[in-house]
C-alpha cells in the first residue's frame, strides 16, 4: 500500500515519519473530553488514532494511501479538532487548508519553519486577518526513529490552547534506550 503510493507519486520516504506516543500524549490535556478528532495523515495503527481512542476520543482517520488526500478530501462526519503530523514537503499547503477549514487544530512541525520566509509571511497574513497561531513547544528534540533528532518538533495550533505559547516538559526524547517506535510502521509493509 505505502510502497505503491511512494512509487506512483515519485516520492521518497523521508517525508513520512510516524509520530511516537510521547508526542501524542502532550496534546491530550488540551482537548475537550469525548470530542471527535480528525487525524488526516493517519492510519488505524497511528499513535494519534490509537492513543486518542484510548483516551476516550472518537477518531476519524484518513490517509492519502487510501485515496483520501487532505488537500482535496474532508470527512462527511462532523469533527471538533484536526490533529496530526503532516508531510513536511507540503507544510504550507497544509497550513493554508487548516486555516481555511476554521476548525481548532494541532499539527506537528519543526520549529525551524518559523524562519522560512514563505511560512512567516503566511502566519503574518493570518494574524492580520484575526487568525492567531499558537505553539505547544516541547522541551526536547524528540526522535521519530531512535536516533538523535536534529531539531525540535512542536505543535502548531489555532483555536485550541488556553495561551498562545505553552511549553511542555517531556521525560525523555524517545531515543536510544528510551526509543518506542510508532505502531503505524505496520501499515507501511501491508
Outline where the language-model segments fall.
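Class I S-adenosyl-L-methionine-dependent methyltransferase catalytic core
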Residues: 1-190
Amino acid at each position: 500500500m505505502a510502497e505503491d503510493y511512494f512509487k506512483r507519486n515519485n516520492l521518497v520516504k523521508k517525508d513520512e515519519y510516524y509520530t511516537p506516543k510521547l508526542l501524542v500524549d502532550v496534546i491530550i490535556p488540551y482537548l475537550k473530553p469525548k470530542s471527535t478528532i480528525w487525524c488526516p495523515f493517519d492510519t488505524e495503527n497511528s499513535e494519534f488514532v490509537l492513543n486518542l481512542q484510548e483516551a476516550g476520543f472518537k477518531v476519524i482517520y484518513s490517509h492519502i494511501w487510501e485515496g483520501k488526500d487532505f488537500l482535496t478530501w474532508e470527512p462527511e462526519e462532523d469533527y471538533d479538532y484536526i490533529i496530526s503530523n503532516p508531510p513536511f514537503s507540503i507544510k504550507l499547503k497544509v497550513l493554508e487548508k487548516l486555516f481555511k477549514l476554521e476548525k481548532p487544530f494541532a499539527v506537528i512541525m519543526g520549529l525551524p519553519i518559523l524562519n522560512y520566509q514563505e511560512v512567516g509571511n503566511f502566519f503574518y497574513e493570518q494574524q492580520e486577518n484575526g487568525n492567531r497561531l499558537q505553539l505547544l513547544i516541547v522541551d526536547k528534540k524528540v526522535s521519530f526513529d531512535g536516533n538523535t533528532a536534529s531539531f525540535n518538533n512542536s505543535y502548531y495550533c489555532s483555536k485550541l490552547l488556553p495561551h498562545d505559547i505553552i511549553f511542555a516538559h517531556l521525560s525523555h526524547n524517545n531515543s536510544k534506550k528510551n526509543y518506542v517506535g510508532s505502531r503505524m510502521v505496520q501499515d507501511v509493509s501491508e
